[in-house]
Amino acid sequence: MIDINELRADPDTYRASQTARGADAGLVDRILEADSRRRSAITDFESLRAEQNAFGKKVARAQGEEKQQLLAQVKQLAADVKAAQAAADEAQATQQQLVTQFPNLIVEGIPAGGEDDFVQLRTEGTPRDFAAEGFEPRDHLELGELLDGIDMERGAKVSGSRFYFLKRDVARLETALLMAAQDLALDNGFIPMTTPNLVRPGIMNGTGFDVEHDDEIYRVGKDDLYLVGTSEVALAGYHSDEILDLSGGPLRYAGWSSCYRREAGSAGKDTRGIIRVHQFNKLEMFVYCHPEDAAAEHERLLAWEEQMLQACGLAYRVIDTAAGDLGTSAARKFDCEAWIPTQGKYRELTSTSNCTTYQARRLNIRERLPETTDAHGKVKKGGTRAVATLNGTLATTRWLVALLETHQQADGSVTVPELLRPYLRGQEVLRPVA
């Protein structure tokens, strides 16, 4: 949630943010109008309450006919106070509804526009030249079927389209990938977590997902719970309504979970294989930190993602996502896209988002500010403020697409990156099953 005080002080910056996103800049003015009505309604209520309190003292001193007249006025005043309270509550609810709709304020300098308006920051690694090696690369599904490791047909039979079974070495490769990612996170101070796959609507909304209008979210109607599309949701909710101690540095969590997405708007896209599916596994980094440290922490998350990609021997590029392609909560997002040989293009494997204080405000997650001492030596207890939250993908099932295609050999076997071999009992090659 945005800071209404900041919007009130600098509405033009918020209008510019909305314009860059391709969103409704007029929402700024509707919020300001609602805010003005709210403050006016509160002033009216407080004025009437003060008058009511003053009347109470007059009634106590009055006698006879005067007292009866005052009591009649008190009765009317009580009704006026009640009506003013209702008007103030309604104005507050209207303002809150509008503020809740407003996406995060983008970081200054990120590209404006939509999905195709990103800025490429750099490329790393060189895509393999299969023509020079003398063979045509197979796609990940063909390789997976040769390894008897991906079964889309039975996935569809059991659960429908965009579901699958992973088997044998491919299933082990996925687990190895996630375990290697978890170890990298552990080495960098993350606390490992397994998280709930179902969350309450308040947590889903608090993270920035609109449960009423988001067609990507699976809902369990009887229990009013939602399947998460990322462990970010559960990890953001983990400290909801809490005051955190960040004096020792950022709180970093690495969440391992299954993820669920309806892919409602993806008809006809990536229908072959496991690039775009309804269920997958992911190792997600999630951080709580001081707001002033968020930009530097964002760069660290990106560096860890790149470290993982490089250790897996994948060629990739880093892009600065355009404002119109950001999620509601993100102020800035970097994507790492790996080269997919059979598609001849880069595809997203990781993303990392700086959500500034947006999620923390919605979920009431704060930190205690340090004590201060005034000129007279009097110690004043520190107040509280919203923390910053960030997230980033360290590994996910989709990585198998890039791993299988990048490291394939002419006979259909796949060389295992050195990073993953210890998690596969030293196995160096995945071989086709006869």
From Swiss-Prot:
SUPFAM superfamilies: Class II aaRS and biotin synthetases (SSF55681), tRNA-binding arm (SSF46589). It is an enzyme of class 6 (ligase). It holds the Pfam family Seryl_tRNA_N. Its EC number is 6.1.1.11. Its main location: cytoplasm. InterPro entries: aa-tRNA-synt_IIb (IPR002314), aa-tRNA-synth_II (IPR006195), aa-tRNA-synth_II/BPL/LPL (IPR045864), Ser-tRNA-ligase_type_1 (IPR002317), Ser-tRNA-synth_1_N (IPR015866), SerRS_1_N_sf (IPR042103), SerRS_core (IPR033729), tRNA-bd_arm (IPR010978). Pathway: Aminoacyl-tRNA biosynthesis; selenocysteinyl-tRNA(Sec) biosynthesis; L-seryl-tRNA(Sec) from L-serine and tRNA(Sec): step 1/1. It comes from the Bacteria. The gene is serS. Homodimer. The tRNA molecule binds across the dimer. PROSITE patterns: AA_TRNA_LIGASE_II. This is Serine--tRNA ligase. It is found in: Cytoplasm.
